[in-house]
């Protein structure tokens, strides 16, 4: 017999659902160990907890309900057209507030949302470092949403279409807000090309979503910008791929198991979701739901 119980085994022992176990962990009411991203429960300590001492301690230590322990039904962070569509079509009841990945992280820290869309570039990948530094001891989980192709979106009537980032010099460049993950990606690409922001010719106005950036280019307010293939295709614009990024969802663990988010997850396993991703273009959804980091 193992000295440790898994979450499923403990839920069966307590005759509760697994999400109730996560609630008790989040409240600090259960003896738990975190090993390689998994929660394990020491059998002897659990038996003592069941014996009564743990129950009394749980009643004393359980925190009062607060906005942070029950975040509002909002998904914040980076914008994604496929995610925006899925939230509507799934009828999950989750509201969207897309104002950039960094803005979403700040809102999560303040307990203002149940999930955050992230595409923060890091030396060894995407998003994990940004999450680990802020939420190491809090009950959040980072799951993959999709991989997206990002590159230069430009007008089809440009005399000399860009073949690399350096070719945008002299063209009116459409920027995003500083909190947007795409601005972090742009900084990395500029560094790789040994370029600086001063080498760009930014238009005065910024755009706050992927589709708004493409709209600005299609209406002639800008010549080029860094965006995703799906947005370029929506507005019949030309596209030069530069990299593939991983867009993840950072989810409050309890909310992950609640009906609204589970409704979204169920919808995303249906054929209509895959068909929409294919129609939009530039998406790889084969890794949807993969856990990339488990906090707490």
Predicted segments with their positions:
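Periplasmic-binding protein-like
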Residues: 142-151, 233, 237-266, 287-293
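Short beta-strand-centered segments that line the small-molecule binding cleft or hinge
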Residues: 104-149
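Short helix-initiation/N-cap motifs at beta->coil->alpha
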Residues: 97-106, 198-215
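Short loop->beta-strand "edge-of-pocket" segments that line small-molecule binding or catalytic clefts
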Residues: 68-78, 165-184
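Flexible hinge/capping segments at coil-to-helix
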Residues: 145, 154-173
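A ligand-binding cleft/hinge motif common to bilobed small-molecule-binding domains
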Residues: 120-133, 214-243
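N-terminal hydrophobic or amphipathic helices and topogenic motifs
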Residues: 1-103, 112, 135-140, 160, ...
């Amino acid at each position: 017999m193992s000295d440790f119980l898994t979450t499923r085994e403990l839920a069966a022992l307590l005759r509760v659902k697994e999400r109730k176990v996560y609630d008790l962990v989040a409240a600090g009411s259960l003896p738990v160990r975190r090993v390689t991203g998994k929660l394990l429960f020491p059998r002897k300590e659990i038996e003592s907890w069941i014996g009564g001492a743990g129950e009394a301690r749980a009643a004393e230590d359980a925190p009062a309900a607060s906005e942070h322990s029950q975040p509002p039904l909002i998904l914040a962070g980076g914008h994604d057209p496929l995610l925006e569509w899925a939230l509507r079509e799934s009828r999950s009841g989750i509201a969207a507030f897309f104002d950039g990945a960094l803005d979403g992280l700040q809102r999560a820290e303040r307990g203002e949302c149940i999930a955050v869309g992230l595409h923060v570039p890091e030396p060894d990948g995407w998003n994990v470092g940004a999450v680990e530094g802020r939420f190491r001891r809090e009950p959040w989980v980072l799951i993959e949403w999709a991989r997206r192709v990002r590159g230069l979106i430009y007008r089809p009537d440009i005399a000399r279409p860009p073949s690399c980032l350096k070719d945008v010099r002299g063209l009116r460049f459409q920027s995003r807000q500083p909190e947007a993950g795409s601005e972090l990606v742009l900084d990395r690409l500029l560094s790789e090309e040994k370029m600086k922001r001063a080498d760009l010719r930014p238009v005065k106005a910024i755009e706050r979503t992927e589709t708004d950036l493409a709209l600005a280019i299609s209406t002639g307010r800008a010549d080029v910008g860094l965006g995703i293939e799906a947005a370029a295709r929506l507005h019949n614009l030309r596209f030069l791929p530069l990299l593939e990024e991983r867009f993840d969802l950072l989810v409050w663990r309890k909310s992950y198991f609640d009906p609204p988010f589970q409704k979204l997850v169920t919808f995303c396993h249906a054929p209509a979701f895959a068909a929409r991703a294919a129609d939009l273009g530039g998406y790889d959804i084969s890794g949807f739901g993969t856990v990339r980091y488990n906090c707490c």
